[in-house]
Amino acid sequence: MVCMHETTSERFDFRTAMEGYAKAGIRAVEPSLVKVREFAQKESAAAARRLLDDLGLKAMSSSNQVGLPEPGDARARSLEDLKWKCELAQAIGCDRIVAPSAGTGQYTEDDYKRGADNLREAADIARPFGVRIMLEFTRTSRFAASLPTALRLVREANHSNVRVMMDTYHFWAGISKFEDLDLLRDGELHHLHFEDVPADPPREILGQPNRVFPGEGITPLGRIVEVLKRKRYAGAASLEMFNPAIQAMDPYQAAVRARAAIEPLIR
C-alpha cells in the first residue's frame, strides 16, 4: 500500500495535504503531528480525525519524536513532547510514532545499555495511549545509523511498545549492508519509508533534499521489497521527501507521482 508522509507536502497545511492525497486515490497517510496540532488548535483533534475518516484515509504512522533513544541533555524535553504527540496520535486513530535517532555525541558501549532503557521509558509513556515507539536508524546518526544497531537496541529494550522501522534512503545511503535485511525476524519490521538514493552527488555529501522518487536512483528497491515480503512485512510504503520543489508541489500531483513510482515496485 502506498502511503504519503506529510513531510512530502511540507508547504501545505494538514487539510490541503490530506484532501490532495485522497483525491489521488491514496488511502494511507503519515501525518506530521505538528501540522495536526496546528489544525487542532483552530478546530479540534476530533475534527482532524473526522477529516481523515471522511476522506477515507488511515493514519498508518505519525511523525515524529527525536531524542528518545540516545542519552543527552535534550531527552527530558523530548519525553515531554512525546506525551502530547502520543495523545494526538491516539486522537487521530494512529497507533505508532517514528522515533529517529539523530545523536551527535561521542558514545560508549554503556550508552547503548542506556539506549535500551531510554526506549523502554519512552514506550511506558506511549503505552497508555495505545501507541508504539518505532526506532528509525538514520545515516547521519552517531548512535543508531544502521539496521543491526537498531535491531540490537529494540531487542534489548524488549518492550511490546518498542518496534523497529526502516527508511530505504537511510538504509542504502548509509552504512547498512544489503545482507543486514536477513537479520530481520518474520514480522519484526513495523513500518517502511520508501524512497530512492540518487547516483549523484557522492554519498559523502548527500543530504535529505537529495532523496528521489523510487525508481529514479540506484537503490535495489525491487530486491529489498522481495526480502521484506519474505520477512512477512505487509505494511505500507511511505514516501518521505525533503526536496523543496517536491514539498511545494500540489499534494494531489505529488501523490499521483508517488503512486506511479511505488505501485509497480510493491505489487
Each model region followed by its residue ranges:
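Vicinal oxygen chelate
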Residues: 39, 65, 102, 205-210
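Glycine-rich, proline-tolerant flexible connector loops at the mouths of alpha/beta enzymes
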Residues: 30-52, 101-107
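Histidine-acidic metal/acid-base catalytic patches
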Residues: 1-25, 56, 93, 144-166, ...
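Active-site acidic/histidine proton-transfer and metal-coordination neighborhood
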Residues: 15-16, 51-55, 70-164, 173
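Active-site-proximal loop/turn and secondary-structure-junction residues that shape catalytic pockets
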Residues: 8-10, 33-35, 65-68, 101-105, ...
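Conserved beta-strand positions in the central sheet of alpha/beta enzyme cores
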Residues: 30, 61-63, 98, 134, ...
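Short, solvent-exposed loop/turn segments at secondary-structure boundaries
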Residues: 40-43, 71-76, 108-113, 175-178, ...
